[in-house]
């Protein structure tokens, strides 16, 4: 299809396949509704906004169907300034499944949630003008093979008004980041508890405005500034951490 908008207005599971040229999927449901979008071999390009625009819901799940390849891209200019990413959500967003997903964020971010962003599966490749993955309230990565190329931060959480939010937590999975600013940036707390992480960053590889912890996993970093920067406290309890180059 060309120039089409697919709007989801009720809770449920929706299986999507095929190509959409200069169109988008919009989720506009009740704030109590949960929506699952199964990407089953999808290619969506939108020149004037997000490829997937989750405007209202309680929670949204984007599931990558097994054995499928999926591609999402946006344009370099948006018709509305409210949205800011190729996949944009005003609610909690989870990406899971075992398929693959390519995200090209040509306007600002690759994936953005105003609430909690969870990645739990899939082979995900993100390129973005600014941040790769941005969950304002939090980012949690528990599984998946994730590659990020970012013009700003690779992974970021920025909530500052709630001390229990603004954190990034990596418990498992494979994460490769090439970032022009920080590799991973958290406002309150950054914890690496597991997984395999490799970061190339022009600024700090790992950065927390407050606290950080290394509790497990294998992390290798190369950075133009600090390897793991925490303003108040850094705890090292377990795991392998290799800083190949840093300032």
Which stretches of residues belong to each language-model region?
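A composition-driven surface/loop motif
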Residues: 1-247
């Amino acid at each position: 299809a060309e120039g089409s908008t697919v709007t989801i207005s009720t809770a449920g599971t929706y299986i999507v396949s095929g190509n959409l040229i200069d169109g988008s999927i919009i989720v506009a449901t009740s704030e109590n509704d949960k929506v699952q979008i199964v990407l089953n071999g999808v290619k969506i390009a939108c020149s004037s906004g997000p490829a997937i625009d989750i405007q209202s819901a309680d929670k949204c799940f984007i599931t990558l169907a097994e054995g499928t390849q999926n591609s999402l891209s946006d344009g370099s200019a948006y018709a509305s300034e409210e949205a800011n990413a190729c996949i944009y959500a005003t609610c909690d967003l989870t990406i899971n499944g075992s398929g693959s997903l390519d995200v090209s964020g040509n306007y600002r971010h690759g994936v953005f949630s105003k609430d909690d962003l969870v990645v739990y599966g899939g082979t995900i490749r993100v390129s973005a003008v600014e941040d790769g993955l941005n969950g304002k309230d939090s980012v949690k990565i528990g599984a998946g093979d994730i590659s990020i190329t970012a013009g700003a931060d690779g992974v970021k959480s920025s909530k500052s008004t709630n001390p229990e939010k603004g954190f990034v937590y990596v418990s498992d999975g494979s994460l490769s980041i090439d970032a022009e600013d920080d590799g991973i940036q958290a406002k309150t707390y950054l914890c690496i508890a597991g997984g395999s992480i490799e970061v190339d960053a022009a600024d700090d590889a790992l950065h927390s405005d407050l606290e950080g912890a290394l509790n497990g996993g294998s992390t290798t970093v190369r950075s133009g500034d600090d390897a793991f920067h925490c303003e108040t406290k850094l705890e090292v309890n377990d795991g392998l951490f290799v800083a190949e180059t840093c300032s």
